[in-house]
């Protein structure tokens, strides 16, 4: 059994801590590793893990030792493997502790997920640092070579069983205060602020098929309130506009959010963690990518669309691509959604195929464990 330090700096939203918490749990549960997760904002961690104590300096959850990443840093012995998630800067004293071990620590920089081809030439390459240690860059991805995707053992089978049971879905939705009506399409919305949202909500309002839009607490809630012309929205609120019913859900733990995705006919997601989980749901998805300076995020979006659409029928691929690009550009959804809405059943089959294909590849945690074994 190896020891692991995973450092997470919560820069924005919950994607960084979401990814690192899933990874830490999987390393401990499935690979028997001793994991310490260092978090600089324990309050953010407590949002995705309600069992967590937001003021505790040290706590053990799901076999993971979760520690507050305090400043100034209180030196501790370094682990066999040290992961800096998403280029967060390790404490200088910890880098020194890594170097002074009898066998220096394996230093990994866990990069952001990307479908871009260039990551294949950079994945797992070392970079000699000023302190004398080599840092290896580990890129999660959808093609080889890459670090793969986070996926717990048995995840897809659990999802299939859940989606095959209407009673299991209804019971879960009822625990959130949701009652699905016959013939109602379920859509989840977890996004950044988006000027394209009102146009889409208008189309859902005017559609022939009724929709229930489930909106967990988050940044997009203010945009939804503006469209509804209400001052505020709170958990449990329900508003009806013609064919569209909108219900506000609480911010939920990761496993519950997975089940919400499994219940829905379409999932609008954001960032990285929910993006990957929506793919494992095997359902149509709409990705709101995190905006970066100089529009560099658009290259990542295009790269994923190229890969995701490669096996789709031409008309579905065209409508999907147009809709995604408009959603991320902030408007112009009308024509794309009209075509895409008719293709949702076909898109669902393709989404299941995509999840199955990606599910055949080794997962991120397994690849990290193997990389360490090969490095020794």
Swiss-Prot record:
Looking up Pfam families in the UniProt record yields: EarP
Which residues does the annotation say bind dTDP? 14-15, 192, 252-254, 270-274
Q: Tell me the keywords, alphabetical order.
A: Glycosyltransferase, Transferase
Q: Null-mutant phenotype, please?
A: Reduced bacterial fitness and reduced pathogenicity.
Q: What does this protein do?
A: Protein-arginine rhamnosyltransferase that catalyzes the transfer of a single rhamnose to elongation factor P (EF-P) on 'Lys-32', a modification required for EF-P-dependent rescue of polyproline stalled ribosomes.
Superkingdom field: Bacteria
Q: Report residues binding dTDP-beta-L-rhamnose.
A: 13-16, 192, 252-254, 270-274
Write down the InterPro entries for this protein, in alphabetical order: EarP
Q: Which family does it belong to?
A: Belongs to the glycosyltransferase 104 family.
* Enzyme class at the top of the EC tree: transferase
Q: Where in the sequence is the active site?
A: 16 (proton acceptor), 272
Q: What is the effect of changing residue 112 to F?
A: Decreased but not abolished protein-arginine rhamnosyltransferase activity
**Any domain commentary?**
Adopts a GT-B fold and acts as an inverting enzyme that converts the beta-configuration in the dTDP-beta-L-rhamnose donor to the alpha configuration in the N-linked (Rha) arginine product.
| Protein biosynthesis among keywords | no
> From what organism does this protein derive?
Pseudomonas aeruginosa (strain ATCC 15692 / DSM 22644 / CIP 104116 / JCM 14847 / LMG 12228 / 1C / PRS 101 / PAO1)
Reactions this protein catalyses: dTDP-beta-L-rhamnose + L-arginyl-[protein] = N(omega)-(alpha-L-rhamnosyl)-L-arginyl-[protein] + dTDP + H(+)
Q: Name one GO molecular function term.
A: protein-arginine rhamnosyltransferase activity
**What EC number is given for this enzyme?**
2.4.1.-
- UniProt-recorded name of the protein: Protein-arginine rhamnosyltransferase
UniProt keyword Metal-binding, yes or no: no
């Amino acid at each position: 059994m190896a020891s692991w330090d995973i450092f997470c700096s919560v820069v924005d939203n919950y994607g960084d801590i979401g990814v690192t918490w899933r990874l830490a749990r999987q390393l401990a549960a499935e690979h028997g590793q001793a994991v310490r997760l260092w978090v600089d904002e324990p309050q953010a961690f407590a949002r995705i893990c309600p069992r967590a104590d937001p003021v505790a300096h040290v706590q053990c959850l799901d076999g993971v030792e979760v520690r507050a990443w305090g400043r100034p840093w209180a030196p501790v012995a370094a682990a066999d493997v040290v992961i800096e998630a998403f280029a967060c800067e390790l404490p200088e004293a910890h880098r020194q502790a890594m170097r002074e071990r009898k066998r220096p620590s394996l230093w990994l920089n866990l990069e952001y997920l990307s479908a871009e081809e260039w990551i294949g030439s950079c994945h797992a390459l070392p970079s000699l640092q000023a302190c004398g240690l080599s840092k290896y860059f580990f890129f999660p991805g959808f093609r080889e070579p890459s670090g793969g995707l986070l996926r717990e053992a048995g995840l897809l089978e659990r999802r299939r069983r859940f989606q095959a049971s209407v009673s299991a879905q209804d019971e879960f939705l009822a625990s959130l205060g949701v009652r699905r009506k016959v013939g109602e399409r379920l859509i989840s919305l977890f996004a950044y602020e988006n000027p394209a949202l009102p146009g889409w909500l208008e189309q859902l309002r005017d559609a022939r098929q009724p929709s229930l839009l489930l909106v967990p607490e988050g940044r997009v809630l203010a945009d939804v309130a503006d469209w509804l012309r209400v001052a505020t929205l709170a958990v449990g609120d329900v508003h009806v506009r013609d064919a569209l019913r909108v219900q506000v859900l609480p911010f939920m733990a990761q496993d519950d959010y997975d089940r919400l995705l499994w219940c829905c006919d379409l999932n609008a997601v954001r960032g990285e963690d929910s993006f990957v989980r929506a793919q494992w749901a095997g359902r149509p998805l709409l990705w709101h990518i995190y905006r970066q300076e100089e529009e560099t995020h658009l290259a990542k979006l295009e790269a994923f669309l190229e890969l995701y659409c490669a096996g789709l029928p031409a008309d579905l691929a065209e409508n999907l691509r147009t809709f995604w690009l408009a959603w991320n550009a902030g408007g112009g959804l009308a024509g794309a959604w009209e075509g895409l809405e008719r293709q949702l059943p076909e898109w669902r089959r393709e989404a299941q195929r995509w999840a199955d294909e990606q599910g055949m590849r080794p997962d991120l945690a397994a690849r990290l464990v193997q990389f360490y074994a090969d490095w020794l």
